Amino acid sequence: VEEALEKIKKKRGCINISDLAAELGYNQSYLDRLFYAATGMSMKKFSTIVRMQSAIRYLQEDKTDEVYEKLGYYDQSYFIREFRKYTGMTPRQWAKKSQKRIV
């Protein structure tokens, strides 16, 4: 489980869970059960959290329209929905709000 955690963090959450399980020599559902038992969340949920934390960092430096591609999202509207679930606002709203705090 520690190795799975580290690999997800290293890839900024941009990782295929079934490929990760195979790489670690586990069945995906078995590894996900182990992961859930150790962390209290699924690997997909953890991966999404890592991606959203990366998005927040990228939004401080990059244009909002570029961030979703850097994080491996193919659909910008899906990224916006995920970001809104995580932060309560769109990436653009978050970027504007964080710029006001910096200035």
Predicted regions located by residue number:
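…primarily DNA-binding HTH/wHTH and HhH modules…
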Residues: 82-103
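Terminal helix-turn-helix DNA-binding modules in bacterial transcription factors
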Residues: 38-74, 97-103
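DNA-binding recognition helix and immediately preceding turn/loop
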Residues: 1-44, 62-71
